[in-house]
């Protein structure tokens, strides 16, 4: 059995909570940085994400909802995904936590994937940049992946595994 891994990312975005909340909960906005989405925005509601650069689809259930601060969903294949938004002056701190079983040989790909999506989210709220999914920038993802794969983040990988085991 593959053990769960907990990945944590934190970004400070130069936008108010409501703007970032819209980007993570409104289907048209989600498509700009993540994938095609349907959202029944209520506790227990269904959320479905279809990656537009692959054949991956994630049917999920909203497990926690506290607008405009917390959205947590759970589904396969990506497990539990949690977005926490905290007002910070004229901006917002976004904490993204992903917990799912990830084999060691796939971990750097998952890290790079979420890193890429969060970069795309920041670009979208900053200037409206939408990913052209059929022609998405694989070289950008590859550069991020190479950073994770290089081993520079071994201690973070280990602490993620330890946190998941608790």
Regions found by a protein language model. Name each.
Residues 1-37, 160-166:
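Hydrophobic ligand-binding cavity/cleft-lining segments
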Residues 17, 43, 137:
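Solvent-exposed, flexible loop/coil residues
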Residues 21-24, 33, 51, 65, ...:
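Tryptophan-centric aromatic hotspots in well-structured domains and transmembrane helices
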Residues 23-31, 47-55, 145:
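Short, solvent-exposed helix-to-loop capping segments enriched in aromatics
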Residues 38-41, 48-103, 165:
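Hydrophobic-ligand binding "helix-grip"
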Residues 93, 98-166:
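Terminal "cap-and-tail" regions of soluble proteins that handle hydrophobic small molecules
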């Amino acid at each position: 059995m593959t053990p769960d891994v907990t990945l944590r990312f934190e970004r400070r975005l130069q936008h108010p909570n409501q703007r970032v909340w819209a980007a993570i909960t409104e289907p048209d906005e989600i498509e700009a940085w993540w994938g095609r989405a349907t959202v029944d925005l209520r506790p227990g509601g269904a959320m479905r994400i279809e990656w537009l650069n692959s054949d991956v689809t994630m049917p999920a259930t909203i497990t926690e909802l506290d607008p405009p601060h917390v959205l947590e969903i759970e589904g396969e294949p990506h497990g539990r995904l949690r977005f926490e938004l905290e007002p910070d002056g004229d901006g917002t701190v976004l904490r993204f936590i992903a917990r799912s079983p990830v084999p060691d040989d796939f971990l750097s790909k998952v890290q790079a994937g979420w890193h890429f999506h969060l970069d795309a989210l920041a670009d979208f709220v900053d200037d409206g940049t939408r990913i052209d999914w059929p022609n998405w920038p694989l070289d950008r993802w590859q550069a991020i992946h190479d950073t994770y794969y290089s081993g520079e983040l071994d201690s973070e990988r280990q602490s993620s595994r330890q946190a998941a085991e608790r």
